């Protein structure tokens, strides 16, 4: 009889913990935009020019490019399933993000820009966010696919959906938080049967924000463990470069401040990356052309030392505003083989300071604009002064 009651109690616990939770409230919100774009030319060449012939390629005429004009749209739908007053499931989807009447993108596997879905999925419907929020007496917990790479000001931000878990505590004007998550997973799994051990990229974040009546200031530390390139050359070159590849560890430190000083609105932020890229395996078997093709200088360990800075000020003079912006992003010195001063940090995809250069909207909808001798305009600001 005792065994019967024990089995019955066990079955009851299993049912209790596996029961579905019904939402007591569902909230919808979202945004829709439709826009048009016109370019008088689809590259940044002022005049046509000729690329001289080489021993292997004929001469090529590069003109200014044709003009283009088109319309595009996107519906972004946010849904909150409120299970209880302290428990919420949040989902976000982008619907029909496409140019009107344009060809559809072929199905693929690579995620779209700032999306958890592919470009072809975004042209139909792609879910980017899905996470649960639990507000407890000791703080708030979040787990699932959430927005990451966003901190402080718009400078340096790229709103990327990533799987992560976080804890947040607010006391007075101070908010503290810790997070951990995954940028990339290349370890062996059902979708990657040829993956290697511990071949992924993870991050661990701790931050604090203090707010007052006329502003706020914050400080964030983000440790990144990047093992994506472990055995990268060994898997391509075989025994010649057995297990050859590299990993890198980096710590990003970024303080920011926003303040209103009378008629002056001031904001500033700094990003500093410090770390090391370490080689492993039989690096002597990697030929120089293979290194060059991967954009690498050598097989010696490299120190990461990169800096970006941003300051913006606006003065309210009543009838009009006066202001200015300054930004700096360090670039890599090709003569320092043991140090990388640029290439990781950038201005971010959320920061679009110009209509043509460093404008993610232009790049996403019109593509990269070709320049002189194979160069092109597109992507985030890197290796630059801006003002």
Residue ranges and their predicted role:
Residues 332-362:
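A surface-exposed, glycine/aromatic-enriched loop/edge motif typical of exported proteins
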Residues 1-4:
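Positively charged n-region of N-terminal signal peptides that target proteins for export
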Residues 39-43, 100-104, 150-155, 176, ...:
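Outer-membrane beta-barrel proteins
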């Amino acid at each position: 009889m005792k065994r019967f009651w024990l089995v019955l109690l066990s079955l009851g616990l299993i049912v209790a913990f596996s029961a579905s939770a019904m939402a007591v409230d569902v909230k919808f919100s979202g945004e829709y935009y439709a826009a048009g774009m016109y370019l008088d030319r689809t590259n940044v060449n002022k005049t046509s020019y000729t690329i001289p012939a080489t021993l292997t390629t004929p001469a090529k005429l590069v003109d200014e490019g044709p003009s283009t004009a088109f319309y595009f749209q996107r519906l972004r739908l946010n849904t909150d399933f409120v299970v209880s007053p302290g428990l919420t499931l949040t989902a976000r989807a982008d619907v029909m993000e496409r140019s009107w009447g344009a060809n559809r993108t072929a199905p693929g596997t690579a995620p779209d820009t700032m999306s958890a879905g592919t470009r072809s999925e975004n042209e139909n419907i792609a879910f980017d966010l899905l996470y649960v929020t639990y507000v407890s007496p000791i703080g708030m917990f979040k787990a699932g696919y959430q927005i990451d790479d966003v901190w402080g000001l718009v400078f340096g931000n790229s709103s990327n959906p990533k799987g992560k878990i976080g804890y947040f505590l607010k006391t007075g004007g101070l908010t503290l938080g810790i997070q951990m998550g995954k940028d990339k997973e290349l370890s062996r799994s059902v979708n990657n049967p040829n993956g290697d051990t511990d071949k992924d990229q993870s991050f661990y974040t701790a931050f604090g924000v203090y707010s007052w009546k006329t502003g706020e200031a914050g400080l964030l530390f983000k440790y990144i463990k990047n093992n994506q390139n472990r055995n990268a050359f060994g898997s391509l070159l075989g025994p010649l470069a057995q297990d050859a590849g590299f990993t890198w560890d980096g710590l990003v430190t970024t303080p920011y401040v926003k303040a209103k000083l009378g008629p002056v609105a001031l904001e500033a932020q700094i990003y500093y990356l410090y770390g090391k890229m370490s080689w492993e395996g039989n690096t002597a078997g990697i030929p120089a052309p293979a290194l060059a093709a991967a954009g690498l200088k050598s097989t010696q360990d490299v120190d990461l030392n990169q800096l970006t800075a941003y300051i913006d000020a606006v003065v309210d003079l009543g009838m009009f505003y006066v202001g200015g912006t300054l930004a700096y992003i360090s670039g890599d010195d090709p003569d320092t083989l043991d140090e990388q001063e640029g290439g990781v940090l950038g201005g971010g995809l959320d920061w679009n300071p110009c209509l043509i250069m460093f404008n993610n909207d232009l790049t996403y909808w019109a593509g990269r604009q070709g320049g002189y001798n194979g160069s092109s305009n597109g992507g985030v600001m890197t290796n630059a002064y801006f003002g």
